[in-house]
Amino acid sequence: MEKLSEKDKGLIRDSWESLGKNKVPHGIVLFTRLFELDPALLTLFSYSTNCGDAPECLSSPEFLEHVTKVMLVIDAAVSHLDDLHTLEDFLLNLGRKHQAVGVNTQSFALVGESLLYMLQSSLGPAYTTSLRQAWLTMYSIVVSAMTRGWAKNGEHKSN
């Protein structure tokens, strides 16, 4: 498992300090980018009749609730940088939930790319190569646990 250095943790915490206070607007940037990268992902949000296209989806209350939840997961990861393993059960379950609704693991990579895009567009010149790498490392730890949960859920369905 990858490890975060103390420097990485500091970079992540410092960059998240302002972003975490405005979760929904930054989450909308993340999801706007995600839907630009793969518009087909819109079909996964069938709980809302307002998800015919990205702008409709991004303004629906149900979807904004999902945006908030995603940003809270990022917030939890940042808050637990010293002990990310304590989120293991939560992340395994999150992976299972994503598998159950038809999300494939390749989409996790697109979310990571969209997260980096949001960070870059929000932080401007403060977005450095070191900061990017720190966030990539943290995200890979989170996604690794989610992927294990996703795979376990798939095993249970095939048995």
Swiss-Prot record:
Quaternary assembly: Monomer. Homodimers and homotetramers. Mainly monomeric but also detected as part of homodimers and homotetramers.
Cellular component GO terms held in the UniProt record: cytosol; mitochondrial matrix
A single GO molecular function term of this UniProt record: heme binding
Domain Globin as annotated: residue spans: 3-151
Residue positions binding heme b: 66, 98
Effect of residue 21 to Q: Reduced membrane transducing activity. Loss of membrane transducing activity
Underlying gene: ngb
Keyword Iron: yes
Cystine residue pairs: none
Alphabetized Gene3D superfamilies for the sequence: Globins
Taxonomic lineage from the root: Eukaryota, Metazoa, Chordata, Craniata, Vertebrata
Organ and tissue specificity: Detected in brain, eye and gill, but not in muscle and blood (at protein level). Particularly high expression in the periventral zone of tectum opticum, with significant expression detected in white matter, preglomerular nucleus, posterior tubular nucleus, torus longitudinalis, hypothalamus, pituitary gland, posterior tuberculum, hypothalamus, synencephalon and formatio reticularis. Detected also in brain regions of the visual system, predominantly in parts of tectum opticum and torus semicircularis, area dorsalis telencephali and medulla oblongata.
Enzyme class, first EC level, given as a word: oxidoreductase
Name of this protein: Neuroglobin
